[in-house]
A protein has these predicted regions:
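Long, contiguous, secondary-structure-rich segments that constitute the structural scaffold
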Residues: 65-80, 85-169
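Long, low-complexity segments enriched in small/aliphatic residues
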Residues: 1-70
């Protein structure tokens, strides 16, 4: 696509970050000087945890966080997505009621076994209402309030170690 001057249209081709280098700085001294150490990406750190799976909690296409949770499409708990290799290792099958837990709590969800998720990772949408849960907790209960994702101190919905097993009746 070209503009009125015949040149290719490139979004933001003349806008540059307000950093000393004029480039995106993933580890910025200028941000650290202005906002403190929280502005600098942390160095890699080992995560020693007894929970082998990493829970990611993406946004739902049925809600805006928890807003609109009372609509018909949101009145049930979202499934837990798991890779077939992880399901087989735990003797779990598609449709099983599973328990997802860590030191912060536990949630019961219906398992959806799918190749759409990587081994070692499980996923369930954030924002479900408490009324959808038999334990009175949703996936957000497993997310640490102590870990901060960014300068705005957002929650780490994609950095939550958990384990999954068959729910006992």
């Amino acid at each position: 696509m070209t503009g009125h001057d015949g040149r290719p249209m490139v979004l933001y081709d003349n806008i540059f970050p307000a950093t000393p280098s004029g480039k995106i700085e993933l580890k910025s001294v200028a941000l650290a000087e202005r906002w403190g150490a929280a502005a600098v990406l942390p160095a890699w750190r080992s995560r020693q945890t007894p929970y082998p799976l990493m829970l990611v909690s993406p946004a739902s296409d049925k809600r805006i966080s928890s807003t609109l949770g009372d609509l018909a499409g949101s009145r049930q708990a979202p499934p837990l997505l798991m890779n077939p290799a992880d399901a087989t290792q735990r003797s779990l099958t598609h449709g099983d009621q599973v328990r997802v837990w860590n030191d912060l709590g536990e949630v019961l969800l219906c398992l959806a076994v799918t190749d759409a998720i990587r081994p070692g990772v499980v996923a369930s949408e954030k924002g479900a209402w408490l009324m959808t849960s038999p334990t009175g907790q949703t996936i957000s209960a497993l997310v640490s309030a102590d870990l901060k994702a960014d300068l705005a101190e957002g929650a780490c919905f994609n950095d939550t170690p958990v384990e999954v097993g068959r729910a006992t009746p």
